[in-house]
Amino acid sequence: MDPATWAKVKDHPCYSEEAHHHFARMHVSVAPACNIQCNYCNRKYDCSNESRPGVVSERLTPEEAARKVIAVANEVPQLSVLGIAGPGDSAYDWLKTKETFRLVTAQIPDIKLCLSSNGLALPDHLDELVEMNVDHVTITINMIDPEVGAKIYPWIFYNRKRIYGVEASRILHERQMAALDGLVARGILVKVNSVLIPGINDAHLLEVNREVKRRGAFLHNIMPLISAPEHGTHFGLTGQRGPTAAELLAVQEACAGGANLMKHCRQCRADAVGLLGEDRGQEFTLDLVPEAPVYDPAARETYRDWVGAEREDRRAAAEAAQAATEAACAASSPKLLVAVTTQGGGRINQHFGHATEFQVFEVDATGVRFAFHRRCDNYCVDGGGAEDRLDRVIAALDGIDTVLVAKIGDCPREGLASAGITARDSWAHDYIEPAILALYRERMTQKQAITA
């Protein structure tokens, strides 16, 4: 990656898998108006117990949003990115989006600005985005064929009128491509989000991937459809299922030769706060933040200095571990899938019983690569575990050889072992990549001894 691009993404948790171990994002819900209807969307406001795009607990004015961002920046030194992702469309509800960015950057000039849009209104604001120093934009692109699009979007609102069917999807497609081209031409990094909808666009997403790569998209994030009936979406109410983990992985792997894939997405709420995989939004509702917070940059500056040192230390440790692995293991050695429990920082630093997700890595003699994450209910409740919860954790770890944890009790360790999953706390609080490589060398050495 060239230095200019790395400078843009190194602190952005969504645009860099490495950065998401260290840095947090914050979404503010200032843009409720939307100009399209998606069959997978129902923008429920006032809902604090769901974790999916478009959901918020409270809608904010730009002034309230700025107040909240300053309060979070003072309490969450990891904060590096302010994003506007709805609950409607940030480019359509443009005046609120623009005013929010203006108010926040007047107080916190170094915060990265990011927005997410369906793309329909984006071409109208390209030059303003440059003027505002927005250098990350996400466009949701689910199709490049209007016939496919008509199955996803019932209507759009464009040029002061509602348009339906294939014609609506044709206009949406043209505007999305114009937005993508215009953003790339202006040096703004574009992440494309695509929702994988089995039987509708699953095969088509390979074409989408090729096209957005050809036009210069920086990342392509293929996400599973969320379609539980209780969410009240058209797809949920009509029985359209989401993809299985295997189906999602198959499409991602089929697209691996196209645009760079983002695999660490958590499908955040439109008011999410914190590291990816956690949401501290309920700690910062309006009734809990000060009326007139004053921004103090000291904690964020100190944290960035610490992260810089940690990154160098982690990089050196990973390089040494990789060299040892290449020396000890044949290039043809088989791959392993290894899960880890982490609270961030790129370390194995979470108790097994507290984990609500597992980060899964693929390792072989050539190195360690992030593969995907698996969510689950945490095993420990009120200080103890439950058998049904362990069963769900085991299901989430299907296909995983080993899980590396900071700590684990005897009961869950034995339960995992009975399911063919080894739990290890030998590398508690170590960096993830060197620990996985150490495990890999150990396994390959054992295998060589058995076959010798």
Swiss-Prot record:
Enzyme class (EC, first level): lyase
Highest taxon of source: Bacteria
Positions annotated to bind [4Fe-4S] cluster 2: C265, C268
Entries under InterPro entries matching the protein: Aldolase_TIM (IPR013785), Di-Nase_FeMo-co_biosynth (IPR003731), DiNase_FeMo-co_biosyn_sf (IPR036105), MoaA_NifB_PqqE_Fe-S-bd_CS (IPR000385), Nase_CF_NifB (IPR005980), NifB_C (IPR034165), rSAM (IPR007197)
Domain Radical SAM core: 20-271
Cofactor comment text: Binds 3 [4Fe-4S] clusters per monomer. One cluster is coordinated with 3 cysteines and an exchangeable S-adenosyl-L-methionine. The two others probably act as substrate.
Pathway: Cofactor biosynthesis; Fe-Mo cofactor biosynthesis
Gene Ontology molecular function, alphabetical: 4 iron, 4 sulfur cluster binding; lyase activity; metal ion binding
Binding site residues for S-adenosyl-L-methionine: Y40, G88, T140
Obligatory cofactor(s): [4Fe-4S] cluster
Keywords: 4Fe-4S, Iron, Iron-sulfur, Lyase, Metal-binding, Nitrogen fixation, S-adenosyl-L-methionine
Residues reported in the UniProt entry to bind [4Fe-4S] cluster 1: C34, C38, C41
EC number: 4.-.-.-
Pfam name, any one: Radical_SAM
GO terms under biological process: nitrogen fixation
Family statement drawn from the similarity comment of this UniProt entry: Belongs to the radical SAM superfamily. NifB family.
Primary role: Involved in the biosynthesis of the iron-molybdenum cofactor (FeMo-co or M-cluster) found in the dinitrogenase enzyme of the nitrogenase complex in nitrogen-fixing microorganisms. NifB catalyzes the crucial step of radical SAM-dependent carbide insertion that occurs concomitant with the insertion of a 9th sulfur and the rearrangement/coupling of two [4Fe-4S] clusters into a [8Fe-9S-C] cluster, the precursor to the M-cluster.
The protein, known as: FeMo cofactor biosynthesis protein NifB
